[in-house]
Amino acid sequence: MASENMTPQDYIGHHLNNLQLDLRTFSLVDPHNPPATFWTINIDSMFFSVVLGLLFLVLFRSVAKKATSGVPGKFQTAIELVIGFVNGSVKDMYHGKSKLIAPLALTIFVWVFLMNLMDLLPIDLLPYIAEHVLGLPALRVVPSADVNVTLSMALGVFILILFYSIKMKGIGGFTKELTLQPFNHWAFIPVNLILEGVSLLSKPVSLGLRLFGNMYAGELIFILIAGLLPWWSQWILNVPWAIFHILIITLQAFIFMVLTIVYLSMASEEH
């Protein structure tokens, strides 16, 4: 619910501000007067990303330690279904030989899903606690709605793409792939390099921006509903959108995982 002291524009802007740390002075940034500098980090995005990553590790480790060959509990059954689903996806889409891909795909799917799931929390709950209890100037709780987080994850995937490309094809083979495709003639090397370079770089960019765009839009719609409508009518739109958003949350985690598997499978193909 929007604060009585805020206009709808102020309310929306307030919820789109990150809690930032200026690395030059190690002080919190005033969200209403941010410095024009590269040396800031969104510590709320980093905090929730790390906490949710640790939550994933704790939950899955606890299930693995308590796993039984008898009749599993509901939580163990759910975890086994997720693992089986991810493992099946990897077997269907990854045609190379690597023990890293399945754990990586599982980590990506669950971690991104948990980050996306934060979007279903009441929009004012944690920011209110942060402001009135902890005295923080701003707080955003959806890490995947921060382009820095999604592009950082995509950068990690890009590094793996380069690693597997060089590992499977060698530096010479990878160089030939960039310079002699699609036109297999030395005269077209500059053209091939541009085309293949753009194609290669577009993978992490599109991977990161796709997740960011969908989650940012979802977060913004929740903020608009809370900021522009009276409290008694917000449920009329909030509940249907939240139900639909559950599909978006799961789908975006799945798409990020699938594209990662596909890109790494392409990088692992020997020519």
Swiss-Prot record:
Keywords: ATP synthesis, Cell inner membrane, Cell membrane, CF(0), Hydrogen ion transport, Ion transport, Membrane, Transmembrane, Transmembrane helix, Transport. Coiled coil: none annotated. One of its GO terms (cellular component) is proton-transporting ATP synthase complex. It is a multi-pass membrane protein. One of its GO terms (biological process) is proton motive force-driven plasma membrane ATP synthesis. One of its GO terms (molecular function) is proton-transporting ATP synthase activity, rotational mechanism. Its main location: membrane. It comes from the Bacteria. The chain crosses the membrane at residues 40-60, 100-120, 146-166, 220-240, 242-262. Pfam families: ATP-synt_A (PF00119). It is found in: Cell inner membrane. PANTHER family: ATP SYNTHASE SUBUNIT A, CHLOROPLASTIC. Belongs to the ATPase A chain family. NCBIfam families: ATP_synt_6_or_A, PRK05815.1-1. Key component of the proton channel; it plays a direct role in the translocation of protons across the membrane. F-type ATPases have 2 components, CF(1) - the catalytic core - and CF(0) - the membrane proton channel. CF(1) has five subunits: alpha(3), beta(3), gamma(1), delta(1), epsilon(1). CF(0) has three main subunits: a(1), b(2) and c(9-12). The alpha and beta chains form an alternating ring which encloses part of the gamma chain. CF(1) is attached to CF(0) by a central stalk formed by the gamma and epsilon chains, while a peripheral stalk is formed by the delta and b chains. This is ATP synthase subunit a. It comes from Escherichia coli O1:K1 / APEC.
